[in-house]
């Protein structure tokens, strides 16, 4: 089997077996701790520009099917696994992981010590990495890798170019696409919403002209400070319409209200992150995928209050506006992959829109 190298910007490297596409690629190397859900993870637009390391030792054992994609065209730069299953077993399986990666033009590497790599990332933080042929000159690879700047316009790359509708007979929702997962749209469709998905740079005036019952801010990749267009829109919407944000939408909501965000050392990426609701003490296990978080101290003096925290590191996981019907969460209530413990948040959004219909927009 052809050999491939994963070189990190700190000089560490791993040599293993090539899987997927043969092309060379550079991205931010991160790790995901989920035991299942590799297909949804690879197709999640929030992973734009990243090389995903799966910590579970066997990936691909139930294959890949056409129904569980979170986006049609995956935006990941590469995939790292300990072992890629060659003979998947599942009645829904259509192609192997290796075949899928080749079809989508995603290079990968298998047969390396993913535990060692994960511990390195936990210690040093996320690092730039390059996947290339094992025969490449290591010094040249390292020099090239260190000279490359990772892109900062991720949302622009994954957002819809123009608005489109997903019809329903119920509430009219505008879903702002910062890299939305298909599962979020499906959750709204399940509740019979008429959803209009709009590009990331849609203005408040354009949204209000659609006369929706509520607005959702989607997940997405990268640093929220790279999306300044969103902040003025959020300020123009909150207080006029019910607002619900997820992941990147949560961070943008915080920035729009005067708080700050920061980059986590190695991020939260997995399906088993415990989150506590402060009002009730309820603890749920959540699906998460983010490299940035809201700075708790920066919320002092703003109109926002913390509603949820992450129990592993006590980072902010939920916010609500003190005056308006607007709330956000850092985690993924739509799951896929992961537990559906917090799926009820979509129902709370529906209730919020009912309150708006009765003319009571303040919290």
From Swiss-Prot:
The active site is at 247 (nucleophile), 332, 334. It comes from the Bacteria. Residues 172-359 form the Glutamine amidotransferase type-1 domain. Keywords: Amino-acid biosynthesis, Arginine biosynthesis, ATP-binding, Glutamine amidotransferase, Ligase, Nucleotide-binding, Pyrimidine biosynthesis. PROSITE patterns: GATASE_TYPE_1 (PS51273). It holds the Pfam family GATase. HAMAP family: CPSase_S_chain. Small subunit of the glutamine-dependent carbamoyl phosphate synthetase (CPSase). CPSase catalyzes the formation of carbamoyl phosphate from the ammonia moiety of glutamine, carbonate, and phosphate donated by ATP, constituting the first step of 2 biosynthetic pathways, one leading to arginine and/or urea and the other to pyrimidine nucleotides. The small subunit (glutamine amidotransferase) binds and cleaves glutamine to supply the large subunit with the substrate ammonia. Composed of two chains; the small (or glutamine) chain promotes the hydrolysis of glutamine to ammonia, which is used by the large (or ammonia) chain to synthesize carbamoyl phosphate. Tetramer of heterodimers (alpha,beta)4. This is Carbamoyl phosphate synthase small chain.
